[in-house]
């Protein structure tokens, strides 16, 4: 009977997460009012540049990491895009809490609305530069099996890394006492994109800067500040239960 109760509770939480995620989310700031990354970020490294030579070296590093079964499994898990409850779960140990719509509604609302604000920033830059991805250039397979979804979409900047570093910035603002753990996890999350061959290192590096630009824009939004305070209050209450 206990197992059935636990299963039902888990199903309720999962259903709540899906319903919350599927609901239309109004961003804190419209895309038109957000900083234009295409006007800020430089072009990705040219193929004959020293910076691209480093990208190739880092691509080789990423392939070496695939020999580590634990690290490559983490990189594959980090590739999750659609299920946000699974996405946030990647920071559970660092943050100290599992984030979901049912149990942490204020934190969930902050994260979902923030991502709805910053995620779209990447699209114009990707389309403008149309950079070829590593697995495309080297005609390689990906351990995360994302080839069909990613082929033909610009590599620069990395959407996963923009999102992952943005999540780290938000969680560190909620729980500054855990910032070191949170950013360490975020750093590895971003590097997972190099390991699976989805992105060049320079894509990932640029995305950390892009995420910081989006995060700074959020700080000037009164609605964001209000929701951040609610999330911080909820976090403190949950951690002291």
Where do the model's predicted regions map?
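Short amphipathic alpha-helical segments
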Residues: 233-241
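Residues in and immediately flanking transmembrane alpha helices
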Residues: 15-16, 173, 216
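Alpha-helical transmembrane segments and their juxtamembrane interfaces
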Residues: 12-13, 170, 213
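Boundary at the C-terminal end of the N-terminal hydrophobic targeting segment
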Residues: 18-20
């Amino acid at each position: 009977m206990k197992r059935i109760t636990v299963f039902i509770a888990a199903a309720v939480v999962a259903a709540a997460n899906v319903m919350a995620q599927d609901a239309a989310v109004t961003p804190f700031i419209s895309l038109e009012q957000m900083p234009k990354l295409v006007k800020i970020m430089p072009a990705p490294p040219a193929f004959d540049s020293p910076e691209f030579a480093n990208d190739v070296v880092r691509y080789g590093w990423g392939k070496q990491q695939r020999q580590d079964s634990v690290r490559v499994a983490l990189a594959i898990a980090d590739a999750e895009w659609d299920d946000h409850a699974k996405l946030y779960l990647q920071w559970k140990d660092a943050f100290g809490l599992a984030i979901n719509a049912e149990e942490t509604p204020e934190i969930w609302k902050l994260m979902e609305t923030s991502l709805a604000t910053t995620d779209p920033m990447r699209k114009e830059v990707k389309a403008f530069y149309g950079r070829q991805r590593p697995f495309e250039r080297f005609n390689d397979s990906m351990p995360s099996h994302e080839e069909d979804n990613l082929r033909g979409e610009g590599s620069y900047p990395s959407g996963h890394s923009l999102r992952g570093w943005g999540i780290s910035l938000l969680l560190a603002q909620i729980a500054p006492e855990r910032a070191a753990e949170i950013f360490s996890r975020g750093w590895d999350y971003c590097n997972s994109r190099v390991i699976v061959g989805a992105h060049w290192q320079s894509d990932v590096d640029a995305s950390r800067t892009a995420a910081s630009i989006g995060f700074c824009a959020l700080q000037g939004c009164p609605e964001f500040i209000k929701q951040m305070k609610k999330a911080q209050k909820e976090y403190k209450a949950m951690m002291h239960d």
